[in-house]
């Protein structure tokens, strides 16, 4: 449910939590190609007007009061945060079954060269009880066209699957959250506002809710995942989830799949340039909430 469930993401929540050991990126463009991103103020004015928001003011410790030997290790204290909840009037919002939680919007500072662009960052999994609840695989109720954690032909999938477990016992949700926090900090430092779809160990937002919020508040959506299932004990590389051919004529996919795949390709190429291992050709076509 894209404009659809979660925008392009590095791999999805309903997804393939059991296929290959490496980080997956599902990157999905919601409204326009990357170079056509709308300013954050316009997005918020047009789309967030109806959503419930709460301002959370946190007080940062003045840097001059922090001992010199520990100043460099102090975590960043963010202020002027907004909690964004699911607006029932948004398209596809009625397909969500778990939606009492909230995403958190982090504004970039003016000192960072604020760009007025909102990047949705989705730390995969992390919704207690999500595996016991079912949501539609596609907005129109049609069946899945590929396999994954939910088999091809199914019309419903777990609202949020539990994810994989690393060989040392660490659950995927913990790793994706830390990844999301690192990505958030880097994006904020570069002037991008960041919409954290999951900002803590647990958020009561299913894959549909996360995607719909992102569709209406962010310029693009990046979901972070890891895969396993083949018994490998090494990192096989990064890839993004591309849109299966069979979905490219179904709305809202038809209006967005090209932007989705373009962003995914750009993300993988950026990782390649930084020396990250890339799996195969850098993409895998899977029918997920974000890609349908």
Could you say what each language-model-derived stretch is?
Residues 1-292:
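Catalytic-site microenvironment of enzymes
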């Amino acid at each position: 449910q894209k404009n659809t469930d979660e925008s392009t993401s590095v791999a999805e929540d309903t997804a393939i939590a059991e296929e290959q050991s490496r980080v997956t990126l599902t990157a999905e463009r919601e409204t326009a190609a990357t170079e056509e991103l709308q300013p954050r103020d316009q997005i918020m004015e047009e789309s967030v007007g109806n959503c419930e928001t709460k301002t959370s003011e946190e007080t940062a410790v003045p840097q001059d009061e922090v001992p010199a030997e520990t100043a460099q290790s102090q975590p960043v204290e963010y202020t002027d945060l907004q909690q964004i909840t699911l607006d029932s009037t948004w398209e596809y919002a009625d397909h969500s079954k778990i939606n009492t939680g909230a995403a958190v919007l982090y504004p970039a500072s003016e000192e960072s060269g604020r760009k007025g662009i909102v990047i949705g960052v989705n730390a995969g999994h992390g919704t207690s009880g999500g595996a016991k609840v079912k949501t539609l695989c596609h907005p129109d109720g049609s069946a899945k066209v590929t396999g994954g954690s939910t088999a091809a032909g199914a019309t419903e999938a777990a609202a949020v699957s539990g994810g994989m477990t690393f060989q040392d016992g660490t659950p995927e949700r913990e790793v994706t959250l830390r990844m999301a926090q690192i990505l958030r900090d880097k994006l904020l430092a570069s002037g991008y506002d960041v919409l954290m779809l999951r900002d803590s160990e647990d958020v009561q937002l299913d894959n549909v809710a996360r995607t719909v919020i992102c569709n209406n508040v962010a310029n693009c959506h990046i979901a972070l995942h890891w895969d396993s299932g083949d018994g490998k004990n090494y990192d096989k590389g990064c890839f993004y989830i591309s849109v299966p051919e069979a979905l490219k004529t179904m709305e809202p996919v038809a209006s967005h799949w090209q932007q989705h795949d373009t962003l995914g390709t750009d993300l993988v190429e950026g990782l390649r340039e930084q020396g990250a291992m890339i799996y195969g050709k850098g993409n895998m076509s899977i029918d997920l909430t974000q890609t349908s």
